[in-house]
Amino acid sequence: MTAREVLKILHKDGWYEVDQEGSHMQLKHPTKPGKVTVAVHGKKDIPPGTLNKIWKQAGL
């Protein structure tokens, strides 16, 4: 799964971009605690462990 696909799912869940430094984008949710960081590296797939961490942080 690419970062673009992950961001699409997160945006549908209500997450929005709050900061970006280089290729790392941070997102925040209006009601869920914390932030989620997604590394956007073109069309490369996100490694499975990183993807699981993103879903866990996002509460999905």
PLM region spans:
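Minor-groove-contacting beta-hairpin "wing" of winged helix-turn-helix DNA-binding domains
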Residues: 24-28
